[in-house]
A protein has these predicted regions:
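Hydrophobic faces of well-ordered beta-strands that scaffold small-molecule active sites
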Residues: 17-19, 34-36, 56-58, 77-79, ...
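Hydrophobic alpha-helical signal peptides and transmembrane signal-/tail-anchor segments
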Residues: 152-176
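Glycine/Thr-rich beta-alpha phosphate-binding loop at enzyme active sites
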Residues: 29-31, 36, 55-100, 104
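Glycine-rich phosphate-binding active-site loops on the catalytic face of alpha/beta enzymes
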Residues: 38-45, 78-89, 125-147
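Active-site beta-loop-alpha junctions enriched in small/polar residues
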Residues: 22, 39, 61-63, 82, ...
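Alpha-helical scaffolding segments of alpha/beta enzyme cores, especially the outer helices
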Residues: 1-8, 24, 28, 41, ...
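Alpha-helix-loop-beta-strand connector modules within alpha/beta enzyme cores
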Residues: 2-16, 46-58, 92-112, 151
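Catalytic cores of alpha/beta
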Residues: 22-31, 62-72, 116-132
Length: 177
């Protein structure tokens, strides 16, 4: 199956294989975990299927959902949508203010989700979140490898600049064009 192929390609690398929405397939494929949305199984139910050693991530859109994910045993949360997304349609956006507040409220790793691309990733990082989930930023790009590496390098330089108080403006102006 495609899930098993994904898991095999990530084995032995510094990469996790996370299956979307389906904890049963995560178990059968040997994946590292599952990511569930608000319309899927709860983190608690996913945990019962996965057991204690696999990761459970949950997409959240507000504080109530975040708190439920934490209580249900999620290992990480996605917060969003931060910006308008080409992948999924939402009637409202939590935006950067929700992202910043949530990131400061929980000890769980927080991933920003929704409409994130090379043009706005700096705004996400500036509110203190250095983990992102992207889809259309990569799949809609003319050069998939180039944009993927650009996003990774951008995250790396932002992290270094944050830790070392380094000015990355020249780097940003090169990669954001």
């Amino acid at each position: 199956t495609r899930a098993r192929m994904l898991v095999e390609k990530t084995r032995g690398r510094k990469t996790l294989s996370i299956i979307n929405d389906r904890p049963d397939i995560a178990v059968l494929s040997g994946a590292d975990g599952v990511h569930v949305g608000q319309g899927d199984l709860s983190a608690k139910d996913a945990r019962q299927i996965l057991g204690p050693h696999r990761l459970v991530g949950v997409s959240t859109h507000n504080y109530e959902q975040l708190n439920k994910a934490v209580l249900d045993g999620a290992n990480y949360v996605g917060i969003g949508p931060i910006f308008e997304s080409r992948t999924k349609q939402f009637s409202s956006f939590g935006g950067l203010s929700l992202l910043e507040q949530v990131a400061n409220q929980t000890a769980l790793p927080v991933f920003a989700i929704g409409g994130i691309d090379i043009q706005n990733i700096d705004a996400v990082i500036e509110v203190g979140v250095t983990r992102v989930a992207v889809a259309s930023a990569i799949t809609a790009a003319a050069g998939i490898k180039w944009i993927t590496y650009s996003l990774l390098i951008f995250l790396f330089f932002h992290y270094i600049s944050y830790k070392l108080n380094f000015n990355y403006s020249l780097f940003y102006s090169f990669f954001s064009k």
